Amino acid sequence: MKMSYNKLWKLLIDKNMKKSDLRKNAGISSSSLAKLGKDENVTTEVLAKICNELKYDVGDIMEFIPDESK
């Protein structure tokens, strides 16, 4: 199962917030931000920090993409 963080990027655009601002304000590393940009797995701690900063739920910033092979 894949994850997509497209919802997060759309929220940042709506809030007129740069990725670097999110990184600093949420206290996440640049490597975590890079993983998000590649739709790779990140820890729940990273997701919690982002949700806390943006005041959104985890379902508002990411979605699961079902495997097509099933």
Give residue ranges: language-model regions.
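Short, charged recognition helix plus adjacent turn
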Residues: K2, K10-L11, K35, M62-K70
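A short, Lys/Arg-rich alpha-helix, primarily the initiator
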Residues: M1-S20
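The alpha-helix within a helix-turn-helix
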Residues: L12, R23, G37, C51
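Short, basic-rich loop-to-helix N-cap that marks the start of a DNA-contacting helix
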Residues: E40-N52
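Residues within the helices of the helix-turn-helix
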Residues: W9, S20, A34, A48, ...
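Short alpha-helical DNA-recognition segment
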Residues: N16-A34
